[in-house]
UniProtKB/Swiss-Prot annotation:
It catalyses: L-glutamyl-tRNA(Gln) + L-glutamine + ATP + H2O = L-glutaminyl-tRNA(Gln) + L-glutamate + ADP + phosphate + H(+). This is Glutamyl-tRNA(Gln) amidotransferase subunit A. The gene is gatA. One of its GO terms (molecular function) is ATP binding. Signal peptide: none annotated. One of its GO terms (cellular component) is glutamyl-tRNA(Gln) amidotransferase complex. Its EC number is 6.3.5.7. The active site is at K79, S154, S178.
Length: 503
């Protein structure tokens, strides 16, 4: 049996039933990663030794009856912008090529407490700045459905690892769509929770007012269970919200009768690929058949989301990334004349072009002559976008639309046109600006065999609504396996049959 073809919950059940040991699960993940990495490059670091050591510890706790949760013993991959004590954490940047944290991010720690085993850190756009996972200092990640295409970003490594069945699930972060857009491109399911639901402690910041950690998995059930495990109030994160409604698995009910679902007309206009539009409207019809009330409405302000986002996110990035100067950790230039020259050369050599572009943009909009004209104006637009969503959620339980305007572009297409790359997040960015929860899940395939993602958006702290709608829609479809996953599975079957024949 190919253990990595199972969902996290299915694998967890087999481990609890003693059908599979934790060591077997971890070894299966490591073997799968090693077999596929040359083709997709979804990992920056593979921690085989640490994972096997942890597997033995977790197995002992399971055998002693101390660990009984759904995720106990399940291998997981972590996006490389979350601190992991003693394990290299690079943000896919040259400037952090040798950074080993002395503490673990709260969300990661909660997974470890649940008995999950970290097998490695996944590739990403450098400092989460990008939508294709091509800005990584460690090379581009490829899409497991077609390796000539991008996996999306910035959590492209995590999404590709799940789609390729290297691991059952992974953690990603979402600042402007970085979980939902690559989930769409890779045909997996990903949730960006309400801002403040999952602790940002230990997440290396890009845009502090926008960043959120969330799960990436094969299906909605896994995502709900993982989100339940990582969501918590954390005093170490000043933006953490003390919620009492974190039982997200309660929403795993196939019932949308009477649910009011709105489709913004703004999401169906120019720039949306016809095949994507057709798949999204077909998904809406499926929910309608199940009893949901579906109608189109005018959301407004969508065209202002991208400029407002890039002003705010880049301003916050220019401040957050000022700490990387080559003094106490990370990359330091070899030759310099004085301290100022060392700062300048270390940052110039350590950061990639997209990161430098955003730092410069952020520094510009925060400068004294332009602060009011750009940054304050962007904050006002952010408030107006939140108001537009508030008005919509006074009428609707869920907003439905595409996760991305197209399916995955080819490698290199977006890098040559940064504006086009930014426009790829047009349907996800406003959700971050408003602090709302969103989920992306597969809803179809285009003529080239690339996945199309459906996005469901909920009101603040109403993750249960989007999980219920997503779960109900998912029941109308069969999960599909990526090309890379199928190839590996077929090869394993052929090898097994060949071995049996030889005997």
């Amino acid at each position: 049996m190919d253990l990595m073809s199972l969902t996290a919950v299915e694998l967890g059940k087999k481990i609890q039933a003693k059908e599979v040991t934790v060591e077997e699960a971890v070894k299966a993940a490591i073997a799968s990663i090693k077999a596929k990495e040359e083709k997709i490059n979804s990992f920056v670091t593979i921690d085989e030794e640490g994972a096997l050591k942890k597997a033995a510890e977790v197995q002992a706790k399971i055998d002693a009856g101390e660990l009984k949760g759904a995720l106990a013993g399940v291998p997981v991959a972590i996006k490389d912008n979350m601190c992991t004590e003693g394990l290299l954490t690079t943000c896919s940047s040259k400037i952090l090529y040798n950074f080993i944290p002395t503490y673990t991010a709260e969300a990661v720690k909660r997974l470890e407490d649940a008995g999950c085993v970290i097998v490695g850190k996944t590739n990403m756009d450098e400092f989460a700045m990008g939508s294709t996972t091509e800005t990584s200092a460690f090379g581009a990640t490829k899409n497991p459905w077609n390796t000539e295409h991008v996996p999306g970003g910035s959590s492209g490594g995590s999404c590709a690892a799940v789609a390729a069945e290297e691991v059952p699930f992974a953690l990603g972060s979402d600042t402007g769509g970085s979980i939902r857009q690559p989930s769409s491109f890779c045909g997996v399911t990903g949730i960006k929770p309400t801002y403040g639901t999952v602790s940002r402690y230990g997440l290396i910041a890009y845009g502090s007012s926008l960043d959120q950690i969330g799960p990436i998995a094969k299906d909605v059930t896994d995502c709900a269970i993982i989100l339940e495990a990582i969501a918590s109030y954390d005093t170490k994160d000043s933006t953490s919200v003390n919620r009492d409604d974190l039982k997200f698995t309660e929403a795993l009910v196939d019932d949308v009768k009477g649910m009011k679902i709105g489709i913004p007309k703004d999401y169906l206009g120019d720039g949306l690929d016809p095949e994507v539009k057709s798949a999204i409207l077909a998904a809406a019809d499926e929910l309608k058949k199940k009893g949901a009330v579906v109608e189109e409405f005018d959301l407004g302000l969508v065209e202002y989301a991208i400029p407002a986002y890039y002003v705010i996110a880049c301003a916050e990035a220019s401040s957050n990334l000022a700490r990387f100067d080559g003094v106490k950790y990370g990359y330091r230039t070899k030759e310099y004349t004085d301290l100022h020259n060392m700062y300048k050369k270390s940052r110039s050599e350590g950061f990639g072009p997209e990161v430098k572009r955003r730092i410069m943009l952020g520094s510009f909009v925060l400068s004294s002559g332009y602060y009011d004209a750009y940054y304050l104006k962007a904050l006002r637009v952010k408030a107006l976008i939140k108001k537009a969503f508030d008005d919509a959620f006074a009428k609707y339980d869920v907003i439905l639309g595409p996760a991305a305007p197209t399916t995955a572009p080819k490698l290199g297409e977006s890098l040559s046109d940064p504006i086009q790359m930014y426009l790829g997040d047009i349907y996800t960015i406003s959700v971050n600006l408003a602090g709302l929860p969103g989920i992306s899940l597969p809803c179809g395939m285009d003529k080239n065999g690339l996945p199309i993602g459906l996005q469901l958006i909920g009101d603040c702290f109403k993750e249960k609504n989007i999980i219920r709608a997503a779960y109900s829609f998912e029941k109308t479809r069969e999960l599909k396996r990526s090309t890379i996953a199928e190839e590996y599975s077929n090869k394993n079957t052929a090898d097994t049959n060949k071995s049996a024949g030889a005997q």
